[in-house]
Amino acid sequence: MESFDIAIIGAGPIGLACGIEAKKAGLSHVIIDKGCLVNSIYNYPHNMTFFSTSDRLEIGNVPFISHNPKPTRPEALEYYRRVTSSWELNVRLYEKVNTVDIHSAKKTISTSKGSYEVDNIIIATGFYDLPFLLNVPGEDLPKVKHYYEEPHPYFGMKVAVVGAANSAVDVALETYRKGAKAVTMVVREPEISKKVKYWVKPDMDNRIKEGTVKAHFNSSITQINEHDITLATPEGEITIENDFVLAMTGYQPDFSFLKSCGIEIGNDEFKTPHYDEQTQETNVEGIFLAGVICGGLKTNKWFIENSRVHAEVIIDEIKGRS
């Protein structure tokens, strides 16, 4: 069994930042991820552009040079590959953490490929793995997608986009412009979210106003069939022809994993995990949280740019105890 000072669960940007700080402090580390490097970014839409400028995504004092005002997904993937190689981080990919044993002097992590004995654990798993489900009949049909990659498969198709935030708006506009036969938005709220990117929202509003993108507000899907969907709308129940449902309904952290590690989850509306905001340590001694997972269901609280500091805070705390 391999032994390390720190195990970092999650090889996203914040997990990598934690690994960098561990190396700088002379602490041995292993970064474990069930997917590929920066798996969430890899699963973003292929044509996605970040909100942040490239300098706000930098970690480890490695410059992030973008050829655009704001970096793209391919640029981010290239950047974090370069960071990982430059710092020679100890990354174990496609390795799922099965259990974490906290009931001994050293913590034991059992994975799909082996076991590790560690003094400290940093959980930086993000929130992109578990989509919020529609919980309606037919959601298990292949035509229903909770992740969107690119518009090409939807050319000539009748598409329903569920949601009203940035992802839903981007998907609706891109599929419309790349030749979808019909694009219909299904929105529970009375309007498109005011939090949609300021340079995109007017475009979406105008497409709805002119009718090139149809929108049903205060509405929800109640049934999904192979060739149509049923909606509950203020005017009553309607059925429309449909080839694909793109459910951009958001994602949530894996609370079951946190609980299996002994971490307490709050009773607040966001199910915020219990941790000390001064040290990032949870109620379990030696287990820390970093990145977006700290916000629980409030997934818009922490981003790469404002949670990079978690890495330094955690490693300083661990180093101060040794």
Feature map (PLM): residue ranges:
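Rossmann-like dinucleotide/flavin-binding elements
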Residues: M1-S3, I8-K34, Y147-E191, Q278-S322
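Beta1-alpha1 glycine-rich phosphate/pyrophosphate-binding loop at the start
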Residues: A11-L89, V169-W199, N267
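Short amphipathic alpha-helical segments
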Residues: G19-E21, Y42-N43, L133-P137, A172-E174, ...
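A Rossmann-like FAD-binding core segment of flavoenzymes
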Residues: E88-S110, S115-Y116, K178-F270
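AMP-binding/adenylate-forming core of the ANL superfamily
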Residues: I121, D243-L246, I287-F288
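Flavin (primarily FAD) binding-site architecture
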Residues: I123-E139, Q252-I263
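Extreme N-terminal leader/targeting segments of oxidoreductases
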Residues: M1-I6, D129-L130, V136-V144
